[in-house]
Amino acid sequence: MLDLKKFLATPNDFEVLVKCLKKRDINRQHLIFIQKKWETSRQLKKKIEQLRKTRNQLEGPQNAEKVRVVKSEIATLEKELNGLNQELDNLVKELPNLPAPDTPFENRIVAKTEYTPLFQPQLTHEKILRKLVLIDEEKSILLSGSKFIVYQDLGSQLLHTLINFMRSENSRRGYRLFDLPYLVNDYNLYHTGQLPKFKEDSYQLNNHNFYLIPTAEVSLVNLYQKQILSEKDLPLNLCAYSPCFRAEAGAAGQENKGLIRLHQFHKVELVKIVEPENSYSELEKLVQDARNLLHLLKISHRVVELGEKELGFSATKTFDIEVWLPVSQRWLEISSCSNCEDFQSRRAQIRVKKREGDKYLPHTLNGSALAIDRLILTLCEYYYNQKENRLEIPEVLKKYFF
C-alpha cells in the first residue's frame, strides 16, 4: 500500500505520484479524484476536532442543549468520515506500487550465461515427457480438467528430487526452511497484493474465507504480520516449497499444454525482509541465489530487468530469469525476483524497532528458486539421451535421487 500522506501533502509531491503511476497506466484524473477525497477527509477531521474542543468548553446545566446539539453534529460528521475513509481505503488498495526511478521503459537483458546440453538436442520436451511417460495428461483431465498434471514414476521422483535439491541449496546459502499451510485467510492475500486486484485469478473455498495460495510468498511474508521485529535480526531469509494455485486463463494454444502454464504448479520460493538501505543489494543477492541453481544444473539462462509496464502489482523493481530451451528454440521464465520496498510491510503492519527505539517499515523481497515444473521440462531438453531413450540425472542431483 502506498503512503498517501507522503504524496498528497504538497502539489509537488502529488505531481511525483502522477508521474510515477502514469507508468503503471493509472491516469491523472483518477488520482485527482482520490486527492479530493483525501482532502475532504482531512477537512472533516479538523471540523470534528474543533467541535470536540467546543463541547469540552461548554460547562454547566445552562449549556446542556448546546452540548446535545454539538454531540449530534459530531456523530453525524464521524459517520460521514468513516464512510469516506472506507471509500478512500478501497481506492488506495487498488493502486500499484511505484516503479523504482531507474526502471527501464522496456525490458532489457542484464546478464546471460550459456551451457552446452549434455546430448545433441533433437526432441522437444513435450515429446520427451510422453516418450518417457513422466506425466499422464489424460488422467489429469479425468481428475481435475485441463491445466492440471499427474506426475508418475520417474516424473514423480524427479519432482521430489528437485524440491529437496533446491531446499538444500537454499538452506546452505542462509535461508530458513519452512513448511506452511496452503490455505490462507483473505487478509493475508491483501497484505502481499493479490487482493483485491487479482481476486478472479484466485481459488476461494465456497462459503469460507480461505484461499489456496498462488505462491508461498503469501505465507512467508505473513509469518510476520502485525509484528515488531528487532533490527538485529535482519535480514530475514526465508524459503518454502509449495504447490501453487492460480485460476488465471493464461495464453491460448501451445502454452496451455504440458507443463508451461498450469492451474496447480510447484515452486520453491524465497523471501527476504531487510533494512531499507540494503534492499537493492539484497535483490542482487536474491537473483544470484536463484541463478546458482541453474549454474549447478548447467542450464543456459539470462536475466531480464522488467520495464515499467511489466512490473507486478506489488513490485518496484523486478528481474526475471529465463532459461533457454535448445530444441524448442525459446526463452522461458523460470524465476521472477522482486523488491517490493515497504509496499507489503505497510499492508501487513510489519515494523522494525531500532536500537534507539524508533520504528520503521522494512522492505520485502521475493523470488522463485525455482519454478519446478518448468525446470523439469528444461532438463528434458538438456539431459535426454535419445540413443538409449532415458533421461540422464545431472550429477548434482544424484545424491537427492531415490
Residues covered by each model-derived region:
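TRNA-recognition modules of translation machinery and tRNA-sensing kinases, especially anticodon-binding
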Residues: K23, N27, R42-Q43, E114-F402
